[in-house]
């Protein structure tokens, strides 16, 4: 699936990929969703899904294409007078599926999303997470090729959000289903996405693998999103600078990626140089592309020792930055 109507970049979403699109309110995320399902047409360029340009499709071709492009909504959009089973069956009924097939398919989907025992419950009897599971099951009913999730977890609490993300990841693995995930939360991207596009003012300003964007964000807005998961959104550093004795050496920010996250680097440097390194803050982050970590370290080294310590860190393939704004 390729879309290149927004901005100079041309993202390509491969089959079976979970692709995140992140941006703040007004960035153009909802417009992009409407382009992907043909509710809006681009002023120029094209939106190509499975070899078909959605923007140029006839009314009938677009109707057929939409059967394979499903939506999961932020506020569930369930029919409140219908049971769980009836809500899931609805999309099969309007596509002309026979009753016998509908019954089997509904039971299969209820098991897939973990709602066994809730078949006859009404939406008013369900929690927010259960309602979203019904929405996901309904979206999967016609075996779509693409699942569009528009802020599917933003109305949920953190624990339920993680449960829904795990469900989407499980569905992606079992069905090899392409998922496009619209969100304003970097936690959602980190948790399940393979690649991500960052939107600002109607344009895609940065795009790439999730791990790459976390470790080497290029745009200011991307760096702002990355800070969401680092615990210091409104500060330059994730610790209280007043607790640091600036006369006692330098403060280094170390970034570990992949194998370097598993090495006892600080312990080995302590033994080698006989210095009492002071760890000010540390965090380890897991993405679908791998693990990376950040450590802020006060190094009580002399002017002659510091270059050697930096060289040792580089030998471990650890990125270093001397923090000057403490």
Curated annotation (Swiss-Prot):
Pfam families documented for this protein: ABC_tran, NIL
An example Gene Ontology CC term for this record: plasma membrane
SMART domains named among the record's database cross-references: AAA, NIL
InterPro entries assigned to the protein according to its UniProt record, in alphabetical order: AAA+_ATPase, ABC_transporter-like_ATP-bd, ABC_transporter-like_CS, ACT-like_dom_sf, MetN_ABC, MetN_ABC_transporter-like, NIL_domain, P-loop_NTPase
Enzyme Commission number: 7.4.2.11
Membrane topology: Peripheral membrane protein
UniProt key word Transport: yes
Coiled coil stretches, renumbered: none
The ABC transporter domain, residue ranges: 1-226
UniProt cross-references to Gene3D superfamilies, sorted A to Z: 3.30.70.260, P-loop containing nucleotide triphosphate hydrolases (3.40.50.300)
UniProt keyword list: Amino-acid transport, ATP-binding, Cell inner membrane, Cell membrane, Membrane, Nucleotide-binding, Plasmid, Translocase, Transport
Compartment list: Cell inner membrane
Binding residues for ATP: 23-30
Catalysed reactions, semicolon-separated: L-methionine(out) + ATP + H2O = L-methionine(in) + ADP + phosphate + H(+); D-methionine(out) + ATP + H2O = D-methionine(in) + ADP + phosphate + H(+)
A single MF term (Gene Ontology): ABC-type D-methionine transporter activity
Function: Part of the ABC transporter complex MetNIQ involved in methionine import. Responsible for energy coupling to the transport system.
Assembly, per entry: The complex is composed of two ATP-binding proteins (MetN), two transmembrane proteins (MetI) and a solute-binding protein (MetQ).
Family listed: Belongs to the ABC transporter superfamily. Methionine importer (TC 3.A.1.24) family.
Descriptive protein name: Methionine import ATP-binding protein MetN
Species the sequence originates in: Erwinia pyrifoliae (strain DSM 12162 / Ep1/96)
Taxonomic classification: Bacteria, Pseudomonadati, Pseudomonadota, Gammaproteobacteria, Enterobacterales
């Amino acid at each position: 699936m390729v879309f290149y109507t927004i901005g100079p970049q041309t993202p390509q979403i491969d089959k079976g990929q979970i692709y995140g699109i992140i941006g703040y309110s007004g960035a153009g995320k909802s417009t992009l969703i409407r382009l992907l399902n043909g509710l809006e047409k681009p002023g120029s360029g094209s939106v190509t899904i499975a070899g078909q340009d959605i923007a140029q499709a006839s009314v009938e071709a677009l109707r057929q294409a939409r059967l394979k492009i499903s939506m999961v909504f932020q506020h569930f959009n369930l029919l409140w007078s219908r049971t769980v089973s009836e809500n899931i069956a609805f999309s099969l009924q309007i596509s002309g599926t026979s009753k016998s097939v509908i019954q089997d398919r509904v039971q299969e989907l209820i098991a897939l999303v973990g709602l066994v025992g809730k078949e006859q419950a009404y939406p008013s009897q369900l929690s927010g997470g259960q309602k979203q599971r019904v929405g996901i099951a309904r979206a999967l009913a016609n075996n779509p090729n693409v699942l569009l999730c528009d802020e599917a977890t933003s109305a949920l609490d953190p624990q339920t959000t993680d449960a829904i993300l795990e469900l989407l990841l499980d569905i992606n693995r079992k069905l090899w289903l392409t998922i496009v995930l619209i969100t304003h939360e970097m936690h959602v991207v980190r948790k399940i996405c393979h690649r991500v596009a960052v939107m600002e003012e109607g344009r895609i300003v940065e795009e790439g693998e999730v791990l790459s964007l976390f470790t080497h964000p290029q745009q200011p807005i991307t760096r702002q999103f990355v800070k969401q998961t680092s615990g210091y959104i409104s500060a330059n550093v994730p610790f209280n600078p007043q607790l640091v004795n600036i006369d006692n050496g330098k403060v280094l920010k170390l970034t570990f990626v992949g194998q370097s996250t598993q090495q006892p680097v600080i312990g080995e440097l302590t033994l080698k140089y006989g210095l009492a390194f002071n760890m000010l803050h540390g965090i380890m982050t897991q993405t679908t592309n791998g693990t990376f970590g950040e450590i802020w370290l006060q190094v009580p080294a002399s002017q002659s020792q510091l270059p050697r310590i930096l060289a040792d860190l580089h030998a471990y393939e650890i990125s270093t930055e001397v923090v000057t704004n403490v």
